[in-house]
Amino acid sequence: MRQHVNPLSRFFQLPLELPAPHELFEHPNLPIHLDIGCARGFFLLELAAMQPERNHLGVEIRRPLVQAAQHDRDRQEQHNLHFLFCNANISLEAWMAALPPDQLQLVSIQFPDPWFKQRHRKRRVLQPALLLAIAAALHPGRHLFLQSDVLAVIEPMVALVELSNCFARPKDDPQPWRSSNPLPVATERERYVQEQGQPTYRVLFERTQAELPALRDLEMAWQQVDNSKDAAPTPHG
């Protein structure tokens, strides 16, 4: 069972200076795939072995999972892969901003902790500031991939991305949800959901040439959308 941590607790609010690519990877100039909330890391351990042409970075807020994943990475000598402990909403923005232009080519957020209640909005992994930092680091045509098995988790993420106007779904991509994963490896959670015969909700976004909105404007728009959903009347049978 997944153990949640509160990202708003004081311990997780301390910013960390994350290592630069040359400290993480054997070939630091390769394109980077960033997986936010990588959990135990099995997905990236498998994917990095299949994609040596990319560097893969997994970040996770639960330190014991990062330590176990990094141990496996070291044992397997996967030099295009690294795992880091951090709160993505506190420490990732500066790291992404320091990357060379167009080095970050894919960001994935898969099956994040289900903080779906409106009062827990600030605990969700994809916050407006983090989204804008991702959008700033991704060049047009690069991708943001989201998936979850909980509609109440992925719908606010999709709403936030669409409100930013910085991303669009690729032409002819299925809507509202992709039936297939664009990545060649499934996460542990994805495999479990498939075994149970339950749906997975996936969206692939492509960075457009649109300029970033003001952070305050995006925060207010997102809050209005969330509040309107909470205020919607419940049907009575």
Curated annotation (Swiss-Prot):
Coiled coil: none annotated. GO terms for molecular function: tRNA (guanine(46)-N7)-methyltransferase activity. The keyword Methyltransferase applies. SUPFAM superfamilies: S-adenosyl-L-methionine-dependent methyltransferases (SSF53335). It catalyses: guanosine(46) in tRNA + S-adenosyl-L-methionine = N(7)-methylguanosine(46) in tRNA + S-adenosyl-L-homocysteine. GO terms for cellular component: tRNA methyltransferase complex. The keyword Repeat does not apply. Keywords: Methyltransferase, S-adenosyl-L-methionine, Transferase, tRNA processing. S-adenosyl-L-methionine binds at residues 35, 60, 87, 113. Pathway: tRNA modification; N(7)-methylguanine-tRNA biosynthesis. Its EC number is 2.1.1.33. Gene3D superfamilies: Vaccinia Virus protein VP39 (3.40.50.150). The active site is at 113. Disulfide bonds: none annotated. Substrate binds at residues 117, 149. HAMAP family: tRNA_methyltr_TrmB (MF_01057). Catalyzes the formation of N(7)-methylguanine at position 46 (m7G46) in tRNA. Belongs to the class I-like SAM-binding methyltransferase superfamily. TrmB family. NCBIfam families: tRNA (guanosine(46)-N7)-methyltransferase TrmB. This is tRNA (guanine-N(7)-)-methyltransferase. The gene is trmB.
